[in-house]
Amino acid sequence: MVKVGIAACGTTPFTKDDDQIESTLFKSTNNLFENNSKINKKDIDAVLVSTNNNSKYLSPILSEMVGIQPKIAHSIESLCNSGTNSIVSAYSYIASGLAEMILISGAERHDSPGQILQWDNSRGEFKHPIFWASIFTKSYKREFSISDERLAVVSVKNHKQAKENPNAISNNTYTVQDVMNSKKLTDDLKLLDCSRPCTGSASIVLATEELTKSISDDPVWITGIGQKTTSASFTKNKSFTSMESTKAAAQSA
């Protein structure tokens, strides 16, 4: 099996800006190339774009914007699994010999259409992610006797880590009491329990072992990869306290 590494990365700040998706993709890709001068764009065999945005033809557009003429160029959409799907696809292209170096760029806007699923009747009238999250939260709290205070600790930890990330949309820290006192959105989730929709992009380059070593002195090697789809809706879940697909993917990796 061909050894595959993550040789380079680039990102934008995540904001509430109203930038077009094409512009956002370009910014993270440009950041990647600015920070990795050893990459020869002529060596990039494929460009994959990961997004829930409804814009079309994004991969060829991005390729032209950054001066790449790849053999393979296409977009990948699978809601919150889009980024993982892109990495699995790129890994497979390289492992099979169809490509040696691949640029993957993911981007979303604050108004992503992926926030609402009109097709899924199993959710009834509750089509926004806050309601899906609330179903899992209520079930988990009931199953494991989790209090609202203990749940709030997760948000406190996440905001503390975000403050250390210069590209994060949130740069504030909060206490458990702050989270508890924030606006109630559902019976089990408050405003500060939730992540904020934002506009931003990140890009990475995957490559064969030889090319990865020629680009980076400190690459990340993909030593295992796994993926699993159990269903698109909630109806096939064994319970609402865990994600069986996540467990299966981890075991596969």
What are these regions (language model features)?
Residues 1-81, 89, 140, 144-147, ...:
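Conserved active-site "lid/cap" helical segment
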Residues 128-170:
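Conserved thiamine diphosphate
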Residues 51-105, 109-133, 170-194, 223-230, ...:
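Conserved catalytic cysteine-centered active-site region
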Residues 18-19, 113-118, 163-166, 234-235:
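Short acidic, glycine/serine/threonine-rich loops at helix termini
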Residues 1-4, 42-45, 69-72, 96-102, ...:
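Short coil/turn connectors at secondary-structure junctions
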Residues 33, 93-94, 212:
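Hydrophobic pocket-lining residues that define ligand/cofactor binding sites across diverse proteins
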Residues 1-19, 23, 152-153, 184-252:
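Condensing-enzyme catalytic core mediating Claisen C-C bond formation in acyl metabolism
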